[in-house]
């Protein structure tokens, strides 16, 4: 009779600081994937508008950082944190499939910006825990990441002014004029 749980398949318990880092890495994978996916989607929706370039710069940084994050996670025995991307994907699909149809371009842009700021806070948390654990390599990565990402996110935030100058575009639904189409379909428009 074979058992499904043998000694080699059981993970030894982690120290609390390592468990916290593991949890943060799961969240880091989610936020970095979101920075790529949502920034790219928002940029595509905005076409040639100036905020699109700022979003694409964040997406490019996220794409470049993901490889390093994978290496850092694997070196610390956190390879399974990439599974967290699946949860993030589910929320991204919900947002793309429904929520972005219900909110304006400007609000969708701000939600994307909020996610970027959340990602920066996650990286700050990773850095603080890495410093507490004496993990200089991880702490240095986080500091460098923040030095590159912060000005990009600031640029995205500065582009909020574009929506003020273009209120018609700001008020459009994330994927077009769904309200007008719905009203037309119901014979109300």
Language model feature labels by segment:
Residues 2-28, 35, 51, 101, ...:
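Disorder-to-helix initiation segments
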Residues 2-8, 71-111, 172-184:
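Carboxylate-rich helix-loop segments that flank metal/cofactor sites and access channels
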Residues 17-28, 47-68, 108-112, 136-149:
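Alpha-helical scaffold segments that form or flank carboxylate-/histidine-based iron centers
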Residues 24-40, 90-141:
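Acidic/histidine-rich alpha-helical segments that form the ligand environment
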Residues 36, 63-73, 94-98, 120-123, ...:
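A structural signal for well-ordered alpha-helices, especially hydrophobic packing surfaces
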Residues 39-43, 47:
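A positional/architectural concept
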Residues 49-88, 156-159:
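Conserved alpha-helical segments that form or flank metal/cofactor-binding pockets of metalloenzymes
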Residues 112-189:
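Preference for long, well-ordered alpha-helical segments
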């Amino acid at each position: 009779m074979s058992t499904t749980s043998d000694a080699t398949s059981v993970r030894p318990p982690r120290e609390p600081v390592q468990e916290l880092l593991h949890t943060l890495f799961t969240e880091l994978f989610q936020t970095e994937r979101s920075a790529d996916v949502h920034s790219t989607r928002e940029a595509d929706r905005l076409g040639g508008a100036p905020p699109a370039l700022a979003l694409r710069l964040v997406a490019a940084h996220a794409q470049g950082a993901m490889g390093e994050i994978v290496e850092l996670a694997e070196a610390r025995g956190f390879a399974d944190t990439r599974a967290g991307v699946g949860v993030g994907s589910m929320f991204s699909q919900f947002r793309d499939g429904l929520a972005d149809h219900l909110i304006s371009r400007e609000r969708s842009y701000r939600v994307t910006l909020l996610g970027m700021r959340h990602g920066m806070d996650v990286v700050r948390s990773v850095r603080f825990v890495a410093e507490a654990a004496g993990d200089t390599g991880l702490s240095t990565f986080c500091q460098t990441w923040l030095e590159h990402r912060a000005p990009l996110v600031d640029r995205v935030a500065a582009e909020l002014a574009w929506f003020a100058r273009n209120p018609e575009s700001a008020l459009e639904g994330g994927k077009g004029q769904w309200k007008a189409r719905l009203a037309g379909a119901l014979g109300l428009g």
